[in-house]
Amino acid sequence: DLRVAGDKAWFRVPVASLGFALDGWTIHRAQNLLGGALARNMLIANQRVTASQAAAVGFIIPVKNPAQAEEFAYEVSRLAPLAMQQLKTALNAQDATYQLSADAQALFDACWSSTDIKEAKQARAERRAPIFHGR
């Protein structure tokens, strides 16, 4: 879902040097995540995508050290589980019509009728961090 990497990280899929083919989903996913030029450089020219290149196109969330990565993971883990599940379902959908799939719509409805949404409103009113339970 999210990629966190330090400044020395790099990414490479050496299919051309190994002589095998990639499925269409993987090729198009690389294009969507990296952009056409970087995906071509990585797949066709067998080039590494550096952390700075990956960060520039939003492929990674750059961090300076493991502690910063852990802090980021901790902050994400504190977010509302139902909202996260609905967002991930909608973001991963293959439908380009901008309509929510039936699964994403059901999760949307569950999120808005959950106790988590009530807790978020209450916590905001009380100026405190919400405590989510995924219900």
Language-model-derived ranges and their functions:
Residues 1-42, 57, 68, 72:
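CoA-thioester-processing core
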Residues 4-9, 55-103, 115, 132-135:
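C-terminal long alpha-helix characteristic of the crotonase
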Residues 20-21, 44, 114-118:
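Transmembrane alpha-helical core positions of polytopic small-molecule transporters
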Residues 26-29, 38, 83-86, 104-107, ...:
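Hydrophobic alpha-helical segments typical of transmembrane helices
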Residues 42-43, 90-94, 107-112:
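Helix-loop "lid/cap" segments that line or gate small-molecule binding pockets
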Residues 46-53:
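Acidic, divalent-metal-coordinating active-site segment for phosphoryl/phosphodiester hydrolysis
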